[in-house]
Amino acid sequence: MRLVVCLVFLASFALVCQGQVYKGGYTRPIPRPPFVRPVPGGPIGPYNGCPVSCRGISFSQARSCCSRLGRCCHVGKGYSG
C-alpha cells in the first residue's frame, strides 16, 4: 500500500515539475557574491565582510562578524555592539 501511495505521489510530482518547466522556463541559480576579506580598523560595512544589516547573511558569517568585530546579530533586533 505504501509503495502505491509513493508511486502516485512521485508521478503527480513529476507532472507538476514538467508543467513548471514549460511555464516558467529555465532560470539559472543566482551566484553568491565573493567573500570580502576584512580590513583591519576599517568601517563596518560590506567592504570588511560584515554587511550593514543582519539580513541575508549566513550563520557562519554572522558568527565571524560577532567574534572579530563585536557586531552580533540578535533575532528581531539586528546588530548590537
Curated annotation (Swiss-Prot):
GO terms for cellular component: cytoplasm. One of its GO terms (molecular function) is chitin binding. Keywords: Amidation, Antibiotic, Antimicrobial, Chitin-binding, Disulfide bond, Fungicide, Pyrrolidone carboxylic acid, Signal. Residues 1-19 form the signal peptide. GO terms for biological process: defense response to bacterium; defense response to fungus; killing of cells of another organism. InterPro entries: Penaeidin. The modification Serine amide is found at S80. Pfam families: Penaeidin. Disulfide bonds join C50-C65, C54-C72, C66-C73. Higher expression in hemocytes and to a lesser extent in heart, testis, gills, intestine, lymphoid organ and hepatopancreas. Traces in eyes and subcuticular epithelium. Not present in the brain. The modification Pyrrolidone carboxylic acid is found at Q20. It is found in: Cytoplasmic granule. Its main location: cytoplasm. Antibacterial activity against M.luteus and E.coli bacteria. Antifungal activity against N.crassa and F.oxysporum. Presents chitin-binding activity. Belongs to the penaeidin family. This is Penaeidin-3c.
